[in-house]
Regions:
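Cytosolic regulatory and coupling regions of membrane transport/channel systems
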Residues: 1-43, 151, 155-160, 170-342, ...
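Pore- and pathway-forming membrane helices of multi-pass small-molecule/ion transporters and channels
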Residues: 10-20, 35-46, 50, 54-76, ...
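Short, amphipathic, aromatic/basic-enriched membrane-interface segments that mark the entry/exit
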Residues: 22-34, 52-53, 75-85, 103-106, ...
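Hydrophobic alpha-helical segments that drive targeting, anchoring, or assembly
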Residues: 69-88, 93-100, 104-109, 233-246, ...
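Alpha-helix capping and helix-loop boundary segments enriched in small/acidic/polar residues
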Residues: 107, 111, 184, 322, ...
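Conserved mid-sequence domains
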Residues: 298-401
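Composition- and surface-driven signal marking solvent-exposed, interaction-prone regions
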Residues: 348-350, 365-368, 439, 469-473, ...
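Hydrophobic alpha-helix feature that most strongly marks membrane-spanning transmembrane helices
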Residues: 359, 375, 379, 383, ...
């Protein structure tokens, strides 16, 4: 492809893949945290309500308790604020849903509100970078509450108070590990970066490019974690400083400095096992590098409302995704109604679950959702006689399914859906029992309708801004490369060199991520492949020229 074809209007349709859709991957390194937190946060208020004879109210407490699956990678200093905002956001959606349910019997209006809430949840969670499961849990709870039978306006404050109580339990559960391991999230984030650097140091030439990208992304994520971590005591401050030194050392591997993979992996193991933080060999000017990188990243990363508004500015790639979610969720709900489903919340949730960064990922997620839901409905049918034997059995089943969901979701979405489907159906049963056969049939119909509507919306609402995002990322990469080259001719100040390396590595990650997203759009103009390849090559060369220990002669070469 010539450079002239970059701006050509021609488009081509990319095939949607089937290979590897159902492949089982590795478990997440901290899967057990959410897998234990979720059932505990649900079980405590549910068992209290069971003892009081009001298990029917557990649907409302579960709205807050489900927030316990979030924020397990956040440092505790920021986790407290993050969880409070997430719980309030959950309750805001529940409040809108309950008021709507109490104010109108029109299923069409309820579906429209559910679709708008789904779009808002998806957009805000992506903008805030909450991480998995993003806005989907908020959408599930709000959509379920929209179809709660016999809701009255007078009961809404009490039901929201129950949700707040469940949220308080979730907050305590997610903060409790900080009493034992207060720097656990920071250690885990840096360990991931060191493990990635170890793989890069031992990578074969044909796998070095992907390993370099993965390492740079892990380092980037670890820096974000450290910048949100508190250091209120001298001991915590000293530990954080050592963690920062390890990150700087991992960054030199990305820049091309050879290292021992075994040593890097050993340092990562020490961090995970709560041993003293390793101390890499000191280098001249390292303190200046640390100060430069920390100051540069702190200035470049807007937080709170300012960061949220920046992510949602006009031209944001999140806006087409929001339009897709609103359109697909509404189509799914209304189609389900037309097919005779009385409470089509599951179709709305399914459509919302399908939407990913591009249509290729959405296609994969749709197939995984369909397969997982079908198997999950079979499991629900098997469990039904047990769960209807009594309230205690119902609560125990939900807790067990929550554990299995969080233990398997990271391995493959379809596998997690096998457990999340019966869990979600049983949680709705807390409010009122429904005929089992009809419930299973409607949920399977809703699944098919939701997947179809979601994929149709992806095809109709195109994300043409994906290619524009590549152009913006390339412009940042070109600027970072030029700045790095300007420092490469002599003996730059270590702090300046470290800042330039860090900016350049982050810019390379952004370009590759933008290309991956745009490449997954099936109806897309020609991508600037030659320009991307040239910019990445120049960026990697400039990054290598700034590797610590290289003199002017080696840089010039």
């Amino acid at each position: 492809m010539s450079e002239k074809s970059i701006g050509a209007p021609a488009v081509r349709i990319r095939p949607l893949p089937l290979r590897g859709v159902l492949k089982i991957g590795k478990a997440a390194d901290i899967w057990h945290k959410a897998a234990l937190s979720a059932p505990i946060a649900f079980g405590v208020p549910a068992l209290v309500l069971l003892a009081l004879g009001r298990l029917d109210l557990a649907l409302y407490t579960s709205a807050g308790s489900l927030c316990a699956i979030y924020a397990h990678g956040e440092p505790y200093a920021s986790r407290a604020r993050f969880m409070a905002v997430m719980i309030l956001g959950m309750l805001a959606g529940v409040g809108i849903a309950l008021v709507t349910a109490a104010s109108t019997d029109s299923a069409a209006i309820r579906v429209a509100v559910a679709a708008l809430l789904a779009a808002a949840h998806k957009t805000l969670c992506d903008a805030a970078r909450t991480g998995p499961p993003g806005g989907l849990i908020l959408t599930f709870v709000a959509a379920s509450c929209l179809f709660v039978p016999h809701e009255r306006l007078a009961d809404v404050p009490f039901h929201l108070a129950l949700g707040l109580a469940g949220g308080a339990v979730a907050w305590l559960v997610t903060m409790a590990p900080g009493l034992v391991r207060p720097d656990g999230p920071e250690r885990t984030a840096v360990a991931r970066a060191l493990e990635a650097a170890s793989r890069l140091a031992g990578a074969e030439p044909d796998g070095a490019a992907r390993a370099r990208h993965d390492t740079a992304a892990a380092i980037n994520a670890a820096w974000h974690t450290l910048l949100r971590a508190g250091a209120r005591t001298p001991a915590r401050a000293a530990n954080r400083r050592r963690l920062e030194r390890l990150l700087v050392h991992a960054g030199t591997v990305v820049a091309g400095t050879p290292d021992d993979p075994g040593r890097l992996a050993g340092w990562a193991a020490d961090l995970r096992r709560d041993r003293p933080v390793p101390r890499p060999p000191a280098r001249p000017g390292e303190d200046g590098e640390l100060a430069g990188i920390a100051a540069d990243r702190a200035a470049a990363a807007p937080r709170g409302v300012r960061g949220l508004l920046r992510a949602l500015r006009p031209g944001s790639p999140l806006l087409p995704v929001a339009a897709r979610v609103a359109t697909g969720a509404a189509l799914a709900g209304w189609a389900s109604m037309a097919l005779g489903v009385g409470r089509p919340y599951w179709a709305v949730v399914t459509a919302a679950a399908v939407f990913q960064a591009n249509i290729t990922l959405s296609w994969r997620r749709g197939l995984q959702r369909a397969v997982g839901n079908l198997a999950g409905l079979a499991l629900f049918t098997v469990l039904l006689p047990t769960t209807r034997a009594g309230g205690l059995a119902l609560v125990a089943a939900v807790m067990a399914l929550q554990f299995c969901t969080e233990a398997t979701m990271a391995r493959n979405y379809w596998l997690g859906s096998v457990f999340v489907t019966p869990m979600a159906l049983l949680m709705v049963e807390l409010a009122a029992l429904q005929p089992a056969g009809r419930l299973a049939a409607e949920r399977w119909l809703d699944t098919c309708v939701g997947v179809a509507a979601g994929l149709l919306s992806c095809a109709l609402v195109t994300n043409r801004r994906a290619t524009g995002r590549i152009g913006a990322a390339l412009a940042r990469l070109d600027a970072a490369t030029a700045a790095a080259r300007a420092l490469g001719g002599g003996a730059p100040d270590p702090a300046e060199a470290a800042r330039a390396r860090d900016r350049l590595a982050s810019a390379l990650v952004d370009v590759r991520d933008a290309v991956d997203v745009a490449s997954g759009e099936w109806w897309q103009g020609a991508l600037p492949a030659e320009r991307v390849e040239r910019a990445e090559r120049d960026g990697h060369r400039a990054l290598a020229a700034l590797a610590p220990g290289r003199g002017p002669a080696s840089r010039a070469a």
